[in-house]
Curated annotation (Swiss-Prot):
The chain crosses the membrane at residues 8-28, 104-124, 135-155, 181-201. This is Voltage-dependent calcium channel gamma-3 subunit. The modification Phosphoserine is found at S248. It comes from Bos taurus (Bovine). Residues 232-252 are annotated as: Disordered. Belongs to the PMP-22/EMP/MP20 family. CACNG subfamily. Regulates the trafficking and gating properties of AMPA-selective glutamate receptors (AMPARs). Promotes their targeting to the cell membrane and synapses and modulates their gating properties by slowing their rates of activation, deactivation and desensitization. Does not show subunit-specific AMPA receptor regulation and regulates all AMPAR subunits. Thought to stabilize the calcium channel in an inactivated (closed) state.
Amino acid sequence: MRMCDRGVQMLITTVGAFAAFSLMTIAVGTDYWLYSRGVCRTKSTSDNETSRKNEEVMTHSGLWRTCCLEGAFRGVCKKIDHFPEDADYEQDTAEYLLRAVRASSVFPILSVTLLFFGGLCVAASEFHRSRHNVILSAGIFFVSAGLSNIIGIIVYISANAGDPGQRDSKKSYSYGWSFYFGAFSFIIAEIVGVVAVHIYIEKHQQLRAKSHSELLKKSTFARLPPYRYRFRRRSSSRSTEPRSRDLSPISKGFHTIPSTDISMFTLSRDPSKITMGTLLNSDRDHAFLQFHNSTPKEFKESLHNNPANRRTTPV
């Protein structure tokens, strides 16, 4: 089914829907379901079994009436009596229920109705916005119509097999083209229903894959911030790092003031909070500064007193 194009599938669905509805409508409306031998004239009280046997002619019947093909009543049709008075059955038996269902022909009529609605759904799928949902409805209608059709055919066969007048002869009846039209309508309806459901499943899978890919794409772009925002965050993070706030070695050598000098010029707000530890630290820092300040002076004097470093003026 994947090898077929979607347009071919829709063409099969449309043509199949029209064919199934047409065949079933013709089958229900015609009288060529069954060919059998029977009496065409109306029953009378003086009739016996022998006279009726001699007057039997070939007839064709549908769902509601029987027509004669031979004899003096050729071409005459009469309504089918599904509940004859001389029939040997009780009203509470399964045969009576079968005859009642056969007389009502509810399943063939229901099949035609479902096929009609299925065809409307197929036609509406060409214009409706959410066409895949309409196609699913059409598939459900056609599958249900096929099931109703086959149930009606089974009931019809069972009713004919259970006819008391047909039991003594195995070859006393045969099925006509109307019956086969109904059978072909069942096959086509089931094929159309399966194709319609397959179209819906394929379309649903495509929409699901498309929505899944769009969702993944949106989530991927949501995780990645814009370039400017990332650059701004990166620059701000660099400015907030502790290493970025440290001074370079050159600035440390020439433009910084030792922390001990700063501590010498800072005063405590509360003189009562000065402890022995702070006094010792200040004395130690003061001694260190004296040593630090005296070292360059002595070094300068040694350089000045060195005779190699003296400048001599030529005479």
